[in-house]
Amino acid sequence: MKPSERRKARRLAVQAIYSWQLSGNNIADVEHEFLTEQSLDGVDVAYFRELFAGVATKKTQLDELIIPHLDRPIDEVSPVEKAIVRLAAYELTFRKDVPFKVAINEAIELAKAFGADESHKFVNGLLDKLVARK
């Protein structure tokens, strides 16, 4: 598997997590929507499914890891940043095969692509604190 296939899976997963967070729709429905309506060229679909389902089913556990490192209530974190840090926290916690530097760098790149101007700094700082605690 090429690293770019996982990168594309992360990108799609962040979009699905974002959609799920905002819509409150069933996980299976959101996954189906993304798998049928998005281009899957070069996407590691199995990894996308794992990331999306993992974040959705472990949201409470992931938030418990994230919240102590926030400078504001989690409800005040933008939905994009929340999706990105939840995905990265999932990889850092449950995917020991993914080096922490890779998980953090990928999250920073996602924040640059989807977040506001300073999102990548927020994501980087938060994930650095999360890794330091482990």
Swiss-Prot record:
Q: Superkingdom of this entry's organism?
A: Bacteria
Write out the GO biological process terms. DNA-templated transcription termination; transcription antitermination
Q: What is the lineage of its organism?
A: Bacteria, Pseudomonadati, Pseudomonadota, Gammaproteobacteria, Alteromonadales
Disulfide bond positions: none
Family per similarity comment: Belongs to the NusB family.
Main role? Involved in transcription antitermination. Required for transcription of ribosomal RNA (rRNA) genes. Binds specifically to the boxA antiterminator sequence of the ribosomal RNA (rrn) operons.
GO terms, molecular function: RNA binding
KW Transcription regulation (keyword) present = yes
Q: Which Pfam families match?
A: NusB (PF01029)
Protein's UniProt keywords contain Amino-acid biosynthesis: no
The UniProt keywords, alphabetically, are: RNA-binding, Transcription, Transcription antitermination, Transcription regulation
Q: What are its GO cellular component terms? A: cytosol
**Protein's recorded name:** Transcription antitermination protein NusB
Looking up SUPFAM superfamilies in the UniProt record yields:
NusB-like
